[in-house]
């Protein structure tokens, strides 16, 4: 389907046009992106190499880190480049590609967090059947399903926006291509289209978030049946999951579970779930996880020994 448009490229307005402020933001976002890449790559490598991190929880955690790597890379490099070089133009096709990648991995993360909550539920509420229920092929299927869910969500978003007429202006008041800022530039009535976007994005996020809250409520209720040591370990694991869920879902729900319009605060909220959350996820999951930190230390020592011999 060929897009009906006159606009061939867009201009991303970004955060500021002040050169001094752009330099400060460049350093800040570059640091955030480096920390995101290092932290998430470290988790992927550690889980892949370590023999002690073979449980489904770490398999899904590595999958989450991989998603965060691609998700962050679909947005941050162009943002950093624009702040450094001052080139904020993006072609129509590149804008659509960014939109597709960002939503396929963002959608996949939504479903994967639901899968991780189910894994946590089985581990705490059905510990004797955990290894039977969460067999390797089941984990692979659940991971694939989360990716398929993200793919379908992204295809639907792209199919909504791709064929719409963009007659001008071409200035996007944002730092990346997203649905609501793009709909603002469409030269036709977008009320019905906005409702579809809300249903596919905001409503889906809200339903999954409510399911997650219910599942964690059941898990917390089940903690009273565990020993004090088991309760502390389970509470540590679940609190990490819940922190990540809140950090990711609350901004997403604010952005997409509302009428298709833009607000000045949107850029700041978008930074939180596109830049900050992918950077914080490795810290949240590793700082309170003794098994993960121990495996990372062993991997670090092994690298030091091999490099010195």
Curated annotation (Swiss-Prot):
Q: Which PROSITE patterns match?
A: G_PROTEIN_RECEP_F1_2
Give me the segments passing through the membrane. 24-47, 56-77, 99-118, 138-156, 194-217, 234-256, 268-287
Glyco sites are at 6, 87
Disulfide-bonded cysteine pairs: these are 95-187
What family is this protein classified in? Belongs to the G-protein coupled receptor 1 family.
Protein name (record): Olfactory receptor 4A47
**Source organism lineage?**
Eukaryota, Metazoa, Chordata, Craniata, Vertebrata
Please give the GO cellular component terms listed in this UniProt entry.
plasma membrane
